[in-house]
C-alpha cells in the first residue's frame, strides 16, 4: 500500500495488474476484498469494499488474476446476498463485520441429477448435460460458458444425488484432453454471456398485475422498464407490487443504498 484516500487505496504493484481485477488488502488479521478501478504505470488504484480504518502504508495486497465473479449453481433460490454474493443468513449480528465472507451456496447439499447427454455427443458452451430441480425451477447443467471449443462427451454420471462440486460429466477436446464438469461454475459479473444460438426480440406482454401499467404502459417479456420519481413517490412500493404480482417464475430483487 502506497497511499490511502478514504476507501480508495493506491498500491505499488510488483507485476502485471489488469483493470477490474480483484485483490485482497491485508491489515492485521483482516483480509478485505477490493477491485482495481485504474492503473497508471506500476500504481494500481483499488476500491476497497470494506472500511479502511487501521490500514497503513506498507500493508500487503494480493492480486487474484480474475474479475469479480458470481457463483452459478443449484441452491441460489430464496437466498439473501450482499453485493459480493455473501449469504447474509449465515452472518451473525445486525451489521456485516469487516472482512466477512460466507459461501454463496451450501456446497455440502446433494441434488437429484438427471442426465440429458450421453457418451459420444458433441457439445459446446451452454450445451445441456443434465438437469436438477430446485423448488419449482428445473436448472439445466451446462457446459461452462468459458469453454469455447467443440467437445465430445466421454462420460456422464447416472441419475442420482450429487453435490455441486462432484464431477457429473467428462468431455474431451479436439486435442484429446479431458475436462471434468461439475454443477457449479463461476462467471465474471461484468462480462456478458454470449454463448447463445438465438436472441429473440421481445414480442409478448409481461403482465405485472398492476392494471394501470398493463393498460397504459405495458412491459414486454425480455424488455426493460424503469420507474422515475422523487423521494417518497412510491418507486420502491411499486417495485414490490410488481415483484409480488408479476407473471414471472423467478424474481430477483436488488436493493442499493437506502433501499437495502
Residue ranges and their predicted role:
Residues 8-12, 44-50, 107-118, 152-156, ...:
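Short alpha-helix capping/helix-loop boundary micro-motifs
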Residues 2-97:
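N-terminal accessory targeting/assembly segments
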Amino acid at each position: 500500500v502506497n497511499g490511502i484516500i478514504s476507501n480508495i487505496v493506491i498500491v505499488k504493484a510488483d507485476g502485471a495488474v489488469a483493470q477490474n481485477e480483484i485483490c485482497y488488502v491485508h491489515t492485521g488479521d483482516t483480509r478485505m476484498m477490493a477491485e482495481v478501478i485504474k492503473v497508471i504505470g506500476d500504481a494500481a488504484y483499488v476500491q476497497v469494499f470494506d472500511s479502511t480504518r487501521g490500514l497503513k502504508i506498507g500493508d500487503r495486497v494480493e492480486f487474484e488474476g480474475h474479475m469479480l465473479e458470481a457463483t452459478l449453481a443449484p441452491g441460489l433460490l430464496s437466498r439473501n446476498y450482499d453485493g459480493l454474493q455473501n449469504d447474509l443468513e449465515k452472518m451473525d449480528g445486525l451489521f456485516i463485520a469487516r472482512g466477512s465472507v460466507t459461501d454463496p451456496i451450501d456446497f455440502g447439499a446433494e441434488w437429484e441429477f438427471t442426465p440429458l447427454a450421453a457418451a459420444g455427443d458433441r457439445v459446446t458452451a451452454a450445451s445441456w448435460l443434465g438437469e436438477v430441480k430446485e423448488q419449482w425451477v428445473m436448472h439445466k447443467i451446462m457446459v461452462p460458458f468459458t469453454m469455447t471449443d467443440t467437445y465430445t462427451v466421454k462420460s456422464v454420471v447416472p441419475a442420482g444425488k450429487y453435490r455441486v462440486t462432484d464431477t457429473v460429466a467428462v468431455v474431451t477436446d479436439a486435442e484429446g484432453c479431458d475436462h471434468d464438469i461439475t454443477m457449479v461454475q463461476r462467471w465474471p459479473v461484468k462480462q456478458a454471456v454470449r454463448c447463445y444460438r438465438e436472441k429473440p426480440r421481445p414480442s409478448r406482454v409481461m403482465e405485472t398485475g398492476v392494471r394501470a401499467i398493463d393498460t397504459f404502459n405495458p412491459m414486454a417479456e425480455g424488455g426493460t422498464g424503469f420507474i422515475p420519481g422523487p423521494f417518497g413517490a412510491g418507486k420502491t412500493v411499486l417495485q414490490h407490487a410488481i415483484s409480488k404480482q408479476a407473471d414471472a417464475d423467478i424474481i430477483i430483487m436488488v436493493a442499493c443504498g437506502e433501499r437495502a
